[in-house]
């Protein structure tokens, strides 16, 4: 008897690498991991290095590291000096010329952290796409994560690209971000920008929806156990649901007169509201990068200038913004040597 055995198909290096990347292990790597893991490691490592050792004396004229006496809230990896423009500040570039200490002094770590951080976030979104495809589910998690990516890219990259240099981007630190928020308000009147309003509505609306949803599910859990702790009344692997959508619908119908009729619409709405808030915020920041104006109620400003007794919350905020600019410009940009004469400083009841 003759047995014919076929030859095993020859596997190329791509197939071998694909199998290794997608192997079932504790931490999934995948093709997205080639981008995510090194960039995330380098950006986090760069931030820890900068906040621990690197000064901002040469870029902002301030201390910004633990080594200089800062704490977690005041330490930061600060933006490059204004004179650097939009240079990528490569270690081997014409600015640092391979000198690591000089590179840190010029603000090279900020560009390093910002660019690697952006690619790390994109890699994390691609990771969610990849795992969703392998598991066989829809990629809505990745689509939702596009919101934080849009905000990061618009704030840390697009905004300074629209300004004169990386100097005007936020530095990577808690107090540094607060300073950037004050800067946006003083120079762009950001809180009166409609895209900021939509962003606030989306983020706070998403938090409200999350709280309501969690409370409603807890409220309508089946009473299928005698224990006071509801988590002891079910098995994590059971097939049947442990709460009543019908009861939840009835409850909210009595509260508001309307309620979500099915889970698909409910959860899509919970996805849509915060993600749209993040996207509209990102669009607004790109508008600020181009120095587009927010709402201007010029008639109120003219009347307030003519009538000392007329004042609105808008005109008070305009005066406050002028005060922010008059203080922040010389303090934040000492290299410009700004000097404001007394007659141009803001006056009025607001200050």
UniProtKB/Swiss-Prot annotation:
Positions of transmembrane segments: 39-59, 123-139, 151-164, 206-226, 277-293
Enzymatic reactions: 2 a plastoquinone + 4 hnu + 2 H2O = 2 a plastoquinol + O2
Residues reported in the UniProt entry to bind chlorophyll a ChlzD2: 116
Pfam families: Photo_RC
Residues noted as binding chlorophyll a PD2 in the record, renumbered to the chain: 196
EC number(s) per entry: 1.10.3.9
Cofactor note: The D1/D2 heterodimer binds P680, chlorophylls that are the primary electron donor of PSII, and subsequent electron acceptors. It shares a non-heme iron and each subunit binds pheophytin, quinone, additional chlorophylls, carotenoids and lipids. There is also a Cl(-1) ion associated with D1 and D2, which is required for oxygen evolution. The PSII complex binds additional chlorophylls, carotenoids and specific lipids.
EC main group: oxidoreductase
Subunit structure: PSII is composed of 1 copy each of membrane proteins PsbA, PsbB, PsbC, PsbD, PsbE, PsbF, PsbH, PsbI, PsbJ, PsbK, PsbL, PsbM, PsbT, PsbX, PsbY, PsbZ, Psb30/Ycf12, peripheral proteins PsbO, CyanoQ (PsbQ), PsbU, PsbV and a large number of cofactors. It forms dimeric complexes.
Family: Belongs to the reaction center PufL/M/PsbA/D family.
UniProt name for this protein: Photosystem II D2 protein
Taxonomic source organism: Synechococcus sp. (strain CC9311)
Gene that encodes the chain: psbD1
